[in-house]
Amino acid sequence: MYDAAFYRVGSLSSPDFALNLRYQKSFSGSSIANRSAEEMKRIGVPESQAVLWGKELNTFLPNVEPGQTLTAIYSPKQGTTFYHDGKQIAQLPGAEFSKAFFGIWLDPKTSAPKLRTELLGQSCPPPIFSEAC
C-alpha cells in the first residue's frame, strides 16, 4: 500500500513530528479519508467524531498514484499540516484531531502494531500520546 516514515523535530521529547507516506498503489482521496475514519474508530475515537473528521479529510485529500507522497506534520501551535508531494494542501488545528489521525499508526491500539514498532524504533511515542516510557 505505502511505505511509511516517522520523523521527529529536535529531541525525542519534542512535541513536533511528521509522518510521510509514499504510496505503492493508486488510491482515491475519498478511499484514504474513509479508511482513516475507520481506523480512528478502531483506536477508540467515537463514531460520530470519526465520521466528521473523515468528511473533513475527504474535502482535501487528493487521489494518489504510485510514488506520490502524503506528509502530515504536527506542531502544537498549528495542529496538523498536510502536504501532497511537498505542496501544502490543508491545515487542521487542534490536538484532538492530530492525536486521532496520527494514532492510526502510533496509538498502541493501531491495527498495524508491527508498523508502529518500526516507525517508533526504540523511542517513545510523541508527547501528544501521553505514554510513559
PLM regions and their residue ranges:
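Terminal leader/tail segments of proteins
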Residues: 1-133
